C-alpha cells in the first residue's frame, strides 16, 4: 500500500496515545482538588474567622502552606487541562488555536505563580500586633 491509496495517505495520522494520559491527568488533579478543598473547608470551619491573627498563624504553618501551594498548583493544572481540551475541540484555525493555547498557558502559569507568591508571603511575613492588619 503506497502513498497513492487512501490508507497510505492516513497512515501515521492515527491516535498518538496522548489522550489517555491527558484524561488520567485530569482525573488525578480532580481527585487532588476534592481532597485538598475538603481539607481546606474543614480547616477553615475550625478556625475563628473573626480573628485575623489566628488565620494568619494557621496559614503560616509550613504544613498548611505546603498544602495550600499544592491546592493552587492542582487547581490551575486542572483548569489548564480542561480548557485545553475545549480549545483543541472548538477553536478552528491553527493560528488561533495556537494563540489561545499560548494565552491559556501564560494565564495558568501566571495565576499559579501569583497564588504561590501570596501563600509564601503570608507564611513568611510575621503578624503585626495591630488587630486586623499586617
Feature names for model-found ranges:
Residues 1-134:
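Membrane-embedded alpha-helical bundles that constitute the cytochrome b-like, heme-associated redox core
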Amino acid at each position: 500500500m503506497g502513498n497513492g491509496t487512501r490508507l497510505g495517505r492516513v497512515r501515521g495520522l492515527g491516535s498518538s496515545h496522548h489522550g489517555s494520559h491527558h484524561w488520567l491527568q485530569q482525573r488525578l488533579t480532580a481527585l487532588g482538588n476534592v481532597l485538598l478543598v475538603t481539607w481546606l473547608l474543614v480547616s477553615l470551619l475550625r478556625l475563628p474567622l473573626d480573628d485575623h491573627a489566628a488565620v494568619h498563624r494557621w496559614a503560616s504553618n509550613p504544613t498548611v502552606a505546603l498544602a495550600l501551594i499544592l491546592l493552587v498548583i492542582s487547581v490551575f493544572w486542572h483548569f489548564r487541562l480542561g480548557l485545553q481540551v475545549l480549545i483543541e475541540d472548538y477553536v478552528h484555525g491553527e493560528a488561533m488555536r495556537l494563540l489561545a493555547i499560548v494565552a491559556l498557558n501564560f494565564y495558568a502559569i501566571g495565576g499559579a505563580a501569583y497564588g504561590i507568591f501570596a501563600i509564601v508571603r503570608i507564611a513568611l511575613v510575621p503578624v503585626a500586633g495591630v488587630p486586623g492588619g499586617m
